[in-house]
Every structure is written in C-alpha cells, then in structure tokens.
C-alpha cells in the first residue's frame, strides 16, 4: 500500500499542498506561532477571508474548522481549526483536539482536495503536551484515511527535529510510514 502519511520538518507556509491547516485562535485574525506565520505569508487576502467568516458566524469554537482561500501561499486553501488550550487534561482536551483534526479532514475531503499539511495543533502557546498531541494526531488521521479516499496525502509538518522524530516513531509503530 502506498504511504499516505508523511513527516516533514520545516516551514508549513512553503509547502505546495492543496490545503494547509492553520492552528488558529477563535477570532481567526492571526496571532503568534504558526497562525501568525501563515497569516504573514498569505498576505491581506487571508485576513479578508477570515473577516468574512467572522461576519457570517462569529468566533470559531474549539474543535471546529472553517476553510478559506490561501492568499499568497502555494496552497489552494487554508483550513483554520481551533485546538484546545491544555488545562491539565480534565477539560475534554483530548476529544477537542481529535475534533480539530477530524473537522479539518472532513473539510479537505468535502472540497475534493487530495493533499493536506497539518502543524502540531495546540502544542505552542496552547501548551498541549507534544507527545500526547502527536498520538492523537496520528491516530485520528490514520483512522480517517483508512475509511476515506481523500485526502490521498497527509503531511505532519514539524517545526523542529525532536517533534519530527516523535511523529516518525508513532507512524513507524503503526506501520504507516
């Protein structure tokens, strides 16, 4: 079977995939970390698209996702998903993080996109433990692509080598890489 899940270390804004997933905050207006980097690289068109979404629905709730155009990014679209803030693991964080991945994947598939790149959602300023977040990400994506034809290719884009190795280990254990 052809490998459908890949680990890449680098800058998610440079990837030529159909969809880049943005680890957004509820306002969708950009912020720090990967959210800010995606907004800066995409230019004003992305902010305008996010403003339109906000006018239609208000804030994006935790675990939900919305899709917009990609502005100046090499991608065709951006899925903005809001992951949970880590509060010790007793506030349904695992389910909310799983929902963030699932709702992103559903939007990718519903719009017939074939490739998607995910950052490590919630592991920056939202302080989700990296190993636990990676386990949820790998399990959720693996289960989804087993049951769905799209997306054909999924990339976990890691900012540093340590996180990339974490994802690679998990995928090797599952036999997906």
UniProtKB/Swiss-Prot annotation:
* Macro domain residues: 1-175
Active site feature: 35 (proton acceptor)
MF term (GO), any: ribonuclease inhibitor activity
Q: Which InterPro entries match?
A: Macro_dom, Macro_dom-like, O-Ac-ADP-ribose_deAcase
**Which reaction(s) does its UniProt entry say it catalyses?**
3''-O-acetyl-ADP-D-ribose + H2O = ADP-D-ribose + acetate + H(+); 2''-O-acetyl-ADP-D-ribose + H2O = ADP-D-ribose + acetate + H(+)
Is rRNA-binding found in the keyword set? no
Q: Please name the SMART domains in this protein's record.
A: A1pp
What EC number(s) would the UniProt record show?
Answer: 3.1.1.106
Alphabetical GO biological process terms? purine nucleoside metabolic process
Residues at which substrate binds: 11-12, 25, 33-35, 122-126
Keywords of the record: Hydrolase
Q: Which domain of life is it from?
A: Bacteria
Question: Which function does this protein serve?
Answer: Deacetylates O-acetyl-ADP ribose to yield ADP-ribose and free acetate. Down-regulates ribonuclease 3 (RNase III) activity. Acts by interacting directly with the region of the ribonuclease that is required for dimerization/activation.
**Subunit composition?**
Homodimer. Interacts with RNase III.
By sequence similarity, the record places it as follows:
Belongs to the MacroD-type family. YmdB subfamily.
Matching HAMAP family, A to Z? YmdB (MF_01205)
Tell me what this protein is called: O-acetyl-ADP-ribose deacetylase
Species annotation: Shigella flexneri serotype 5b (strain 8401)
């Amino acid at each position: 079977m052809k490998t459908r899940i890949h680990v890449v270390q680098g800058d998610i804004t440079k990837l030529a995939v159909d969809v880049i997933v943005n680890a957004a905050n509820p306002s969708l207006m950009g912020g720090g970390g990967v959210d800010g980097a995606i907004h800066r690289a995409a230019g004003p068109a992305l902010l305008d698209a996010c403003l339109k979404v906000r006018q239609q629905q208000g804030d994006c709730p935790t675990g939900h996702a919305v899709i917009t155009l990609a502005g100046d990014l090499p991608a065709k679209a951006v899925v903005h998903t809001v992951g949970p803030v880590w509060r010790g693991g007793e506030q349904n964080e695992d389910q909310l993080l799983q929902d963030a991945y699932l709702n992103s994947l559903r939007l990718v598939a519903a719009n017939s996109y074939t490739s998607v790149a995910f950052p490590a959602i919630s592991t920056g300023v939202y302080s989700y433990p990296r190993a636990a977040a990676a386990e949820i990400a790998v399990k959720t994506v693996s289960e989804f692509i087993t049951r769905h034809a799209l997306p054909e290719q999924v990339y976990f884009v890691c900012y540093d080598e340590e996180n990339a190795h974490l994802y690679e280990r998990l995928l090797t254990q599952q036999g997906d890489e």
